[in-house]
Amino acid sequence: MRDRVKALLVVILALQSAGICGQFIPKDYSHKEMKAAKNWVDSTYNHLSMDERLGQLFIIALYTNKGEEHIEEVRKVVKNEKIGGLILMQDDARREIELLNEFQSEAKVRLLVGMDAEWGLFQRIKTAYKLPWAITLGAIQDKRLLYEMSAQIAADAKKVGVHWDFAPVVDVNTNPKNPIIGNRSFGSDVGNVSQSALHYSKGLQEQNILAAIKHFPGHGDTDVDSHLDLPLVSHSTKRLNEVELAPFKALINKGIGGVMVAHLYVPALEKRVGIPASVSYDIVTRLLKKKLGYKGLIITDALNMGAVAKRYKAGELDAMAFKAGNDIMLFSQGVAEGKRLIRKAIEAGEIPQKRLEESVKKILLTKYYLGLNKEYTPLSAENIDRELSSPAHKALAQKLYSAALTLIKNDEHLLPLRKNETYYYLPLEEAPHQTFADELAKENTIVVIKNEKEIAGIPRNSKLIVGLHKDNSTAYKPYKISDKSKARLLNLAEHHQIILNVFGSPYALKDIDITPISTVLVSYENNDDSMVATAQSMQGKQPINGRIPVLVNDTITYGMGMSLD
């Protein structure tokens, strides 16, 4: 046994000395497999031309909803530029599988295929099943459930040919006005974000799907969407180390395969004015690679985003990102020009030849670990839509929403609901609500209030369930409650026993005085599964154990919540 461990260490050290030690290693990998990986990487690298080596650094986007002209353009880039991978965007699963079968069968080195699937493949494939957002997961106390969810995402990813889920988000969301992170963050507490992300990442990687923690060095306290322009993170180095960088530092030695670098301007880390983190040598190489010691794949955020695309030319941007220390340029808009400029910089001695070898061998090693060294077996698209949206997905989603449900107040002990009592139900705000009413009505007498006249007819001191149903059709919809709904809620609280359900972000309560409200629940999202899970928990069929994952205001703080069995 001792000799076997010693031999394995020798191989690992050999990989490190060759500059190809990625952070991700499949579970229970043997000495023999590690040695085979090194041999394959060396052999493959040596058989690639300079142009093919450069191609491995690039991932471009594939949309199946943009028509054949776009697909033909992707086909040309894949064939002519010998790129390293694809990111799947808004996709039809069947067409996407057909195209991957074509591209993978023809590739000299198989493509590394990624996707943003933070809440499952639904994020890109609308026939897939929607699983909860990170803010919902952050409320769950049993983090093993997050592993269960990401393991399901991994199983789904394999069915459509995806090897890399660009998730989880480890940004600490300390800014309620953040327009792009918000629901995508596990919350405002460093420890909770780190633990949630670790379980999520393990669920992916233990099924051999790569994870990527993002958005380094921390996108949580911004009020600009980097898809549109360059956000500023103006905190001191001390604050950055304590908050923004803390989850990355906690996770960097946990074997996570990728780190995605954001398009952010962080003056405390980059002294040159207006330079995004993604093209900053100080941030990518000096901080992430050298100071923090990260050895896995480093990938840029999408290079078509306004934060960088408005500032730099396509191709030039790719070369800058590579010089900064990134291994992979994601969503490249100028592969041929990027390759030309990187090659020119290598020939001029601006970038060491060894640097290219390091990145390409890291990419190849990851491909080997993910099984991309093997001959491609075409995927089947038959029944794919049904497989991505099954009864098992529904059961998992409802279990997760039930575990996240958070009871902030229950002053009059109105929960659980009593079967022999009548409850009035008033839906407020813009989103659907009927599923919630229908589920409640299975066990209770529910009178749905539909207009002003019916509100006036509610007997005084009635038990009134008020649902704040926010539009959750995307993760980026506003969470704020209208002044009209807030005024109506507080007026009703003067005359009735209120059970308030927030089917949306807990930040919706930021400007609401909950003092006169008897009972307050947060369900985090407004969809059929969250409504069913909430109704069943209110009826006592499931326990309530969630905790608020963000600091909302002085009254509603991180970790707030009570259990109800």
Residue ranges of predicted features:
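Catalytic domains of carbohydrate-active enzymes, especially glycoside hydrolases
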Residues: 73-89, 151-164
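A substrate-binding/cap region within the structured catalytic cores of diverse enzymes
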Residues: 140-162, 169-190, 197, 201, ...
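Second-shell residues forming the walls of enzyme active-site clefts
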Residues: 49, 70, 86, 94-111, ...
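Short acidic, glycine-rich surface-loop motifs adjacent to enzyme active sites
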Residues: 75-91, 176-177, 252-275, 463-475
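Short glycine-enriched loops at secondary-structure junctions
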Residues: 63-66, 115-123, 163-173, 213-219, ...
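Bacterial Sec-dependent N-terminal signal peptides
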Residues: 1-27
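Preference for extracellular/luminal or secreted protein segments
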Residues: 22-60, 64-76, 290, 314-565
